[in-house]
């Protein structure tokens, strides 16, 4: 029988940073609420969580790198909403934010979780921030807890 290694869903004793884009705040604030709720329900306290606001999603990777490189956090959670418009701006922002966030995780060894909604419409973003499709902020926070514990288990 193989040995299975996986992270648990206990947040107590872990430190989390949450980066939240202010652009489309009517969505990202709901994602933040979901993330905070999941972290606290899993055992994190307010003093275990730092929330950093940035102007928009494009600014997330730089701040993620600073937070992860500080080694003060067991995981960094990135939240925001990029909604497609009439120009190619959407593709540029989404590509850079997703690649940048992943690169930070690989460079630092700190889990950086991508909770930036990338939707075609405002309705899709609303659905994913607490209505029909659940709250992706909550989902990403749960994944952050699991990844923080998995990284610890592998050390």
Curated annotation (Swiss-Prot):
Binding of (2S)-2-hydroxy-3-oxobutyl phosphate, residues: 86-87, 128
Tree of life domain: Bacteria
Pfam assignment, any one: DMRL_synthase
Residues binding 5-amino-6-(D-ribitylamino)uracil: 23, 57-59, 81-83, 114
GO molecular function: 6,7-dimethyl-8-ribityllumazine synthase activity
Top enzyme class: transferase
The protein's Enzyme Commission number: 2.5.1.78
Active site residues of this protein: 89 (proton donor)
Catalytic reaction list: (2S)-2-hydroxy-3-oxobutyl phosphate + 5-amino-6-(D-ribitylamino)uracil = 6,7-dimethyl-8-(1-D-ribityl)lumazine + phosphate + 2 H2O + H(+)
GO biological process: riboflavin biosynthetic process
GO terms under cellular component: cytosol; riboflavin synthase complex
Keywords: Riboflavin biosynthesis, Transferase
SUPFAM superfamilies, A to Z: Lumazine synthase
Pathway: Cofactor biosynthesis; riboflavin biosynthesis; riboflavin from 2-hydroxy-3-oxobutyl phosphate and 5-amino-6-(D-ribitylamino)uracil: step 1/2
Family annotation (PANTHER family): 6,7-DIMETHYL-8-RIBITYLLUMAZINE SYNTHASE, 6,7-DIMETHYL-8-RIBITYLLUMAZINE SYNTHASE DMRL SYNTHASE LUMAZINE SYNTHASE
HAMAP family referenced in this protein's UniProt entry, alphabetically: Lumazine_synth
Protein family per UniProt: Belongs to the DMRL synthase family.
Described purpose of this protein according to its UniProt entry: Catalyzes the formation of 6,7-dimethyl-8-ribityllumazine by condensation of 5-amino-6-(D-ribitylamino)uracil with 3,4-dihydroxy-2-butanone 4-phosphate. This is the penultimate step in the biosynthesis of riboflavin.
Protein name: 6,7-dimethyl-8-ribityllumazine synthase
Lineage of producing organism: Bacteria, Pseudomonadati, Thermodesulfobacteriota, Desulfobulbia, Desulfobulbales
């Amino acid at each position: 029988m193989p040995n299975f290694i996986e992270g648990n869903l206990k947040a107590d004793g872990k430190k989390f940073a949450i980066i939240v884009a202010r652009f489309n705040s009517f969505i990202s604030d709901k994602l933040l609420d979901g993330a905070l709720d999941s972290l606290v329900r899993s055992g994190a306290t307010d003093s275990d969580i730092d929330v950093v606001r940035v102007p928009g999603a494009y600014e997330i990777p730089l701040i993620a790198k600073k937070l992860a490189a500080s080694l003060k956090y067991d995981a960094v959670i990135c939240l925001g909403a990029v909604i497609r418009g009439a120009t190619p701006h959407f593709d540029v922002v989404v590509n850079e934010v997703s690649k940048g966030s992943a690169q930070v995780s690989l460079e630092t060894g700190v889990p950086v979780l991508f909770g930036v909604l990338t939707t075609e419409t405002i309705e899709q973003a609303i659905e994913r921030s607490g209505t029909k499709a659940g709250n992706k902020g909550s989902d990403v926070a749960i994944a952050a807890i699991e990844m923080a514990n998995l990284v610890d288990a592998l050390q």
